[in-house]
Structures are given as C-alpha cells and as structure tokens.
Amino acid sequence: MANPQNLHPGPVFLAGPTAVGKSEVALRLAEKLGGEIISVDSMQVYRGLDIGTAKPTAAERAAVPHHLIDVVEISQPFDAAKFVMLARVAEAQIVARGRVPIFCGGTGLYFKAWLDGLGEAPAADATLRAALEAAPLETLLNELRERDPTTFETIDRQNPRRVIRAVEVIRL
C-alpha cells in the first residue's frame, strides 16, 4: 500500500463566475496542500489593470505564490494560446518544487483551452482582419450563415470580435 505522505495530488481546478469565492477557496487550499495559484483570468494578466479585476492583494500574494498575474503590458495582445503556453511553464515549475498547482479563475475559454487543447486555426492575417473589421456585422453574419451554419448557430452573434475571427478562419 502506498504511503499517503508520498501521494501528490494532481492539479486542482476552481472555476466559476465572478464573486463566488474562488480566490478565497484557492488560498485555503494552497495553504493546506502546499500549493501555488495559477490565475485563469483574462484581465489579471495585464500590468496596471488593477481596478475591476479582483487581483489578489499584496498580502495574499506574499502568503501564497501566484502565477500569470501582471505578466503583460495592457498594450500587448494576450490570448488562450499564450495562456496555455505560460500556464504549462508555471505548472511544470510548481510541480518541480513539489507543490500543487491550483488553477483558479473565471475565464472559461482559458480553462477549455487548457483542458481540451486548442483547435488548429490559422494565424491571424492583418490585411484580411482590417477588411473584415470595416465590413458591416450583418454582412459578416450572412457569410458565416452560408459558409459555416454550425458556427453561426453556436457563436455569440452580438460579439463582433468573435464573428470577425470566425469569418477570417473560413476565408483563410
């Protein structure tokens, strides 16, 4: 029988909507399990974006190491692929120290990318993107409906960024 003291739990995942207490639970778990927290929040990655992002306090960050907070400038792009890349590095470093990675946040896309991987999508094309951004949303939605009805039915049609990217992927 394995010695329970030698068992090392795998990563812990805490996901949910804003203001349900995820961060508090993550802090308690980190203290109990000897863990470190990996932020799964699309806004906490940005330096200087402190209002409205519920970043952990300096005291909380001193008590328990946090990762993927304040890692890029607000002017730099950051996406799910970059999150996965940085989260892999953070997780490997945490595990190498014999500690437990605790993924905590509310950005569902980042959790999905981490757990399910990212689909094979073409890289963005600046020229095409500019043309699509200039087009009326209704025109893009019509093209999406005709060329990819499945995506049309599932996409947030009120979100121009998602519609533009969907049409961009179709055209590339």
Residue positions per predicted region:
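Phosphate/pyrophosphate-binding catalytic cores of soluble transferases and nucleic-acid-acting enzymes
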Residues: 1-172
